Amino acid sequence: MKEYSSDKIRNVAVVSHDGTGKTALVESLLLTSGAVDFVGKGQDNKHIMDFEPEEIKRNVTIQLGMAPCEWHDHKVNFIDTPGYNEFHGEVRAALRACDGMLMVLSSTSGVETDTVRAWDYAVELQMPRMAFINKMDVDGADFFGTIERMRELFGKGIMPLQIPIGEGADFEGVVDVAKMTAFTYKDGQPTEVAVPAHLIEKAQEIREMTVEAAAEGSDELLEKYLEGEELSLEEIRQGLREGMISGRVCPIMCGSATSRIGLDQVLDRMIRYMPDATKKVMTATDAETGEQCVVHVDKPLTAFVFKTLLDPFAGKQSFVRIFSGELKEGDRLFDVNQGVEEKWGKMVTLIGKQQIPVSAAKAGDIVVIPKLANAKTGDTLTAPDFKVTYDAIRFPQPLYTVAMEPVKKGEEEKLASAVLKVAEEDPTCVVVKNAEARQLQIDCMGEVHLEHILNKMDRKYGVQAKLVTPYIPYRETIKGSAETESKYKKQSGGHGQYGHVKIQVDPLYDGSEFAFVDKIFGGAVPKQYIPAVEKGAKETLDKGLIAGYPMIGVQVTLLDGSYHSVDSSELAFKVATSQAIKDVIPKAKPVLLEPIYEVNVFAPDAFMGDIMGDLNSRRGRVLGMEQSERTGISVVKAQVPLAEMSDYVTALRSITQGQGVFNRQFYTYEEVPHKQAEEIIAAHKTQE
């Protein structure tokens, strides 16, 4: 594959809801372009793009895949993405690397949840969008119904460039409304024909919409249109391109990936309407000054690692988008985030898992660099004399928390290492570092994602894990005040031990976890032993007095005490204080606290009642409901105990038929109800 200049490169993220035929479309586009000489069939589990064992087993895309093709002296880099929502992090990574998005919709299913989710993220990134309505040859295909629904959700910028000739078993081609000509297909090859008579009126109606949208692309075209002059085909295309790049217009095409109908026109329109890399202007941060700067394609080399793959045998592969300059074999490469110069030997491009050597790549291209020792997903790679960083990818928040331990005893370190390697590949698998829990916890996207993680650790790193109950960081506190005194005295011949303290405990109401007050007068307890008293109190409270959880919100006041000139020591006062704390806390109305989270649930209005009922069943407090920015979507705001959220990802998906999402953040600690507290305390006692 030859080297292409920046203006001849198109980077396209292909996204959809699961089951629309997205991967089949990518592979058929590769076949149409001549990049491959065969395509797999999903039912045979032989996709070029889905080659990981888990993908073959499930017949779904799990991780993003790369595939370039050449078409009319241009290079198109396709990034195929997973459709299942638990792997949406891969979609976000792909969109950061690309300049345009191709949405794939099924003509029978229409607009589905994850299509909307991808659209919203592309809008957030101000990314041009194009759509392909697939499966027009399937029974129940409804092109115009899908267009109508898209307009309801995404606005009047949804602009069909084609209409189908027939639907279902009668589907045989497409009408190009701008040219007012038609194409029928046999074995993927087009034949230009006249527009069928029964479609002329509809095609002219849509053409008028298209011309009007194109005219709004510039003042010059709009003036010409309003004066009643006819726009030329080139002017229509120019206006549509400007409209798409601005995000005002989303061109719509249709066809069939499996029958290869309309695919040549998809490639034509990608080149015609998708922005090239010269249009990409990036904002970066100067690594030395911290100031924002603008990076054009003609600046020195900058590149961004948007995906990392690890293989126990082949090593690391870093997927890299070049935003400026040029990368050639032998060039120096600096990882600004890690602060090191990377040693590297070669770069390749991929079609599925097939590697194709690349000697040089210009701004706008996407390559894979093997065996970068330090680079991680989200890192910026630059020329050594032009150190800037790009913002990291904003991945979805993983909210499904699990704890695990190895099936085989003694493999704890092996399991921890495997989890960290999986997390390096997949930023939506987050290892929770919590020394208090004394267990390995991860946050992931859901049950399917978790199963994929467990299978990958077994297959790649030879370690099996079993799930255990995740640790909930309960806390203990007191609601009352109490006093006590304790004397630690030990004499066994020779030097003994003596420490005597009188203390008071009180609840703190300012949010502090611990406070120590010294009220000793007249040297009843010498000053050199006061720190030991404080340490003894703090360490004992940290171990917990009710159920083994740290006790917070407690003020300990040293009121009085006594000492022995020979036998007293720091240890003696520390032990005496510990005994006093254990004695006084039960008198101070101790209670158990649990973490409460603020939760925002986004879902269609029709599910609001069921969502609020479910939150109430989880001991949640529903604070209110309001409309979101998207029509028909509401937001429920609630406060919910963390202990009741372990299965909420799965439950919400079930309640809303996959259309609900939520986020959460820690809010406060509150007292655990009596019944639940008794259960927690009883469980602790059985483990002692």
Map each language-model feature to its residues.
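Structural and coupling elements of P-loop NTPases
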Residues: 1-688
